[in-house]
UniProtKB/Swiss-Prot annotation:
Notes concerning its domains: The N-terminus is important for protein stability.
Transmembrane segments: 73-92, 95-113, 124-140, 144-162
GO cellular component: endoplasmic reticulum membrane
UniProt keywords, alphabetically: Endoplasmic reticulum, Membrane, Transmembrane, Transmembrane helix
InterPro entries documented for this protein: TB2_DP1_HVA22
Location of this chain's protein in the cell: Endoplasmic reticulum membrane
Lumenal topological intervals: 93-94, 141-143
GO biological process, one term: vacuole organization
Lineage top rank: taxon: Eukaryota
A Pfam family: TB2_DP1_HVA22
Protein name: Protein YOP1 homolog
Region (Disordered): 1-25
Amino acid sequence: MRMSKLYKNKEKENEKPSNEPPIKQDSLKRMSSKFLGNSLNSFDLSGKLEQVDEYLKKYPFIIEFGYKLGIKPSYIVVFGGSALFISLVLGWGAALICNLVGFAYPAYQSFKAVESQGHAETKLWLTYWVVFSLFFFIEYLIDIILFWIPFYYVIKLLFLLYLYMPQVRGAETVYNYIIRPILLKHEKTIDDTVHKISQTATNHLNQFTGNIAEKLVQEGVRRRNV
């Protein structure tokens, strides 16, 4: 009996209301809406789009294209970027997009650098092609593994842009800190190997062409005698 009374008294003590006032649902809603409003105000979407429109004035063809469609140029960039991202994620023409970014644009810029005879720009694009060639070779060797990496084409596109974007010039960083030290260390070995291979190939080619020429001469002599 005493134990049951003690147990009941403890239950009553636990059931006593606490002195702390409960948080009302209305106050929670106001707090959440205030937080959301502050977040949206801190990220001024219209202001960001206006900045994009201002930047796109450097590219008249985008301005003209937007004027024909009846929309702001920033919308074209947003829609185009979204479509590009979806294509890369789903693999729709992802290889073509990466080839355009990795081959076509750098090739045209290399042409402009050569024609302008600008030493700095020519060096930049030569550096890019050295890094890109190594990247292409490694990609070819481990293509089966790369197939299973999620969002690989997105990563590849960002890496290619990183290599030649003027704001970062990533190709120079990769070349100076990774490729250049390795090539300088093994330059003599590489040169000797290339020289031996080219000399061997030249000897085999000369021997092959010599055998063909000899057979042609013998065939000509045989036909004359007939």
